[in-house]
A protein has these predicted regions:
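Inter-Walker segment of RecA-like/P-loop motor cores
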Residues: 1-37
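Short, conserved secondary-structure transition motifs
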Residues: 11-19, 73-79, 125-132
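A general structural signal for short secondary-structure junctions and capping/turn motifs
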Residues: 13-15, 29-31, 58-62, 109-115, ...
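Flexible loop/turn segments at secondary-structure boundaries
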Residues: 31, 47-48, 76-82, 129-131, ...
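Walker B beta-strand of ABC/ABC-like P-loop ATPase nucleotide-binding domains
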Residues: 39-41
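Signature of the SF2 helicase/ATPase Hel1-core->accessory helical subdomain module
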Residues: 44-118
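ATPase catalytic-site recognition across NTP-hydrolyzing enzymes
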Residues: 112-174
Length: 174
């Protein structure tokens, strides 16, 4: 696929035609640092020891011109990344911050910047289908494939309680 765009994948880094460099780093907090630039984290709600990785890797995007972007299928509310998603990481123990309300889910469905400076955007399968994905996805077939809890997590962007999780995160990190 990459060859169609004149890009050779070598396992190191990729330099795009506009000069941008893509580096693929591990999710190991001891090795996923040291560069600067935009940070993109994929499937962060499934990364073990996310808190430590977030602390060190997000520093790569310290300059104002860089941003940190995390995207993921939700997992359990007990996952460390959920504290970043719901704002509790930012609130910490600060009484003033603990009193700050975050936007409702309806606002996040159109995208919004939250009090912690993080842009949150929820895209459920229903919105994607309404936006044109219907040419590639039969939503009723997908709904029929899963039980309601699993569908809500995988396609409805809903976090589940650990007891209802499709995959028990604590078992995955053993």
């Amino acid at each position: 696929f990459a060859q169609q765009f004149g890009i050779t994948l070598t396992g190191k880094h990729i330099r795009l035609s506009n000069g941008a460099m893509l580096r693929f780093l591990s999710t190991n907090a001891s090795t996923a640092q040291g560069f600067n630039g935009h940070l993109y984290g994929d499937e962060v709600f499934w990364i073990p020891k996310f808190t430590r990785l977030h602390e060190v890797a997000s520093a790569m995007a310290t300059h104002d011109k860089y941003r940190t972007t995390y995207f993921s299928t939700p997992s359990a509310k007990t996952h460390q990344a959920y504290l970043v998603w719901n704002g509790d990481d930012w609130r910490g123990d600060d009484p003033a911050r603990r009193a700050v309300e975050f936007p409702k889910e309806s606002a996040m469905r159109v995208g919004c910047e939250c009090p912690d400076g993080i842009w949150r955007y929820i895209i459920r399968l229903e919105e994607a289908v309404a936006g044109g994905l219907s040419a590639r996805v039969d939503i009723e077939r997908i709904r029929n494939r899963y039980n309601p809890t699993t569908y809500a997590m995988l396609y409805g962007c809903e976090f589940v309680d650990s007891k209802d999780a499709v995959f028990k995160f604590s078992e995955l990190v053993r």
